[in-house]
Amino acid sequence: YDYTLAKISDTSPTLHGELSHLLPTSGSTGSPKLVRHKYGNIEAAGLNISTFFELKESDRPLMVLPLYYTMGLSMVFSHLRVGATILITGLSMTDINFWKFLKEQRATSFTGVPYSFQILNLMRFFRMDLPHLELLTQGGGKMPTDLNIKFAEYCRDNGKRWIATYGQSECTARMAYLPAKWAVEKVGSIGIAVPNGELSLIDTDGNPITTPHTEGEM
């Protein structure tokens, strides 16, 4: 085979002192990219998320999302911040042993993307006896309205909380959430900004939008 010798530098580029990790995302464009996050981002997001979810040390969240995914990662550092116990299993949601694990370990919360809840819906989730499950949270894309309402009403009628969220990998996951008390009434809305955060809409000239049903940029 033909080959060419090339002299290259053996020095590595200097990393920024505050860089904690690179988070993969496809973003709205569909092309893969990496988002840079500093340690302060993790600390702030952990505080904000644990605050609006009202997380506590006795919580036992079930981990089903991958750690390289922004929402899965945010679930970890927000719960670790309050000293909660994170339940980890390699079992699929379609495996009967997954549900045995959930019940035996008394899981108190479940976080998923729209596809996760589509699977739960097909598995007759609403007929299951899950007395320890207190909180269901959703993110990772817009959920079909009928399915959103179905889970919101189930949680309302069974003493549980349903909280849909909106976010971006660039913002360490969650940027907005719809409080459980508005889950049915305001279904489809991204809700309000997370604690210590602000959201606003602007028009093409950069002016704030204050009227309803007006298109703009967030």
Report each predicted region and the residues it spans.
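Short beta-strand->loop structural element characteristic of the AMP-binding/adenylate-forming
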Residues: 1-3, 33-36, 63, 85-92, ...
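Conserved AMP-binding/adenylation subdomain of ANL enzymes
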Residues: 43-60, 68-109, 194
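Gly/Ser/Thr-rich phosphate-binding loop
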Residues: 107-112, 121-185, 198, 208
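Conserved pre-ATP/AMP-binding loop-to-beta segment of ANL
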Residues: 7-24, 31, 54-60
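Conserved AMP-binding A3 loop
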Residues: 19-47
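Short Gly/Pro-enriched turn/cap motifs at secondary-structure boundaries
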Residues: 188-193
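Conserved beta-loop-beta connector loops within the AMP-binding
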Residues: 200-218
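Short, well-ordered beta-strand segments
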Residues: 20, 60-62, 68, 218
